[in-house]
Amino acid sequence: MNFLRKIVRNCKDEDDQKPPLVSAPPDDDDLWLPPPEYVPLTEITGKRNMRNFCINGEVKVCSPNGYSFRILRHILKSFDEIYSGNHRMIGLVKVVIGLALSGAPVPEGMNWVYKLRRTLIFQWAESRGPLDGEELEYSQEITWDDDSEFIGLQIRVSARQCHIQGRIWCINMNSRACQLWSDMSLKTQQSEEDKNSSLLLE
């Protein structure tokens, strides 16, 4: 077993900093409800504080015995406490992680890799969100480890403002992305300007 655990750690990128550990998930971790103020973004009519971002996102899951979304969701519930990137763009990062993990993974050795490359429309509430022209290069590794199981989560997100027409970032409330955003406590509010839009509060 110790030999296997040494092999497992080879599927992670070497890093001098020890990634944060997350505690074990509770048994009822699969119970969830979307945040009550969340409204799916459908068609934007208001233009205030709206920005298009060209996004490259990657979430790499490393686990020798497969993994369940119950554990991934449990890890992401601690995201606010362990996030190490630009806090003016934490809402954008949460959206990208949710969308990436909603796609199909590509196996890569002991890893499963989820990728997202898309232009997305974001709207922030007044005085929230990134500065004008601000870009993001975010990379972090998070691990969950106990005597029986190890999961490494490597997250990379790059974002730059661009003029390509963006897409909506939520299609229906029952999607896996919305479930993950609920887990990560994505902070939003309904737009006063457009009842079909959600403004990011982070």
Curated annotation (Swiss-Prot):
InterPro entries, alphabetized: Rhabdo_M (IPR006870), Rhabdovirus_M_sf (IPR038617)
Domain of life from the UniProt record: Viruses
Designated name of the protein: Matrix protein
GO annotation, cellular component aspect: host cell endomembrane system; membrane; viral envelope; virion membrane
MF (Gene Ontology): structural constituent of virion
Sequence motif PPXY motif, location on chain: 45-48
UniProt GO BP: viral budding via host ESCRT complex
Alphabetical keyword list: Host membrane, Host-virus interaction, Membrane, Phosphoprotein, Viral budding, Viral budding via the host ESCRT complexes, Viral envelope protein, Viral matrix protein, Viral release from host cell, Virion
UniProt record similarity statement: Belongs to the lyssavirus matrix protein family.
Localization per Swiss-Prot or TrEMBL: Virion membrane; Host endomembrane system
Pfam family name, one: Rhabdo_M2
Entry note about domains: Late-budding domains (L domains) are short sequence motifs essential for viral particle budding. They recruit proteins of the host ESCRT machinery (Endosomal Sorting Complex Required for Transport) or ESCRT-associated proteins. Matrix protein contains one L domain: a PPXY motif which potentially interacts with the WW domain 3 of NEDD4 E3 ubiquitin ligase (Potential).
Annotated segments matching region Essential for glycoprotein binding: 125-161
Membrane topology: Peripheral membrane protein
Record function comment: Plays a major role in assembly and budding of virion. Completely covers the ribonucleoprotein coil and keep it in condensed bullet-shaped form. Inhibits viral transcription and stimulates replication. Plays a major role in early induction of TRAIL-mediated apoptosis in infected neurons.
Self-association state and partner proteins as the record states: Homomultimer. Interacts with nucleoprotein and with the cytoplasmic domain of glycoprotein.
Note, other: Most abundant protein in the virion.
Main subcellular location of this protein, as a coarse class: virion
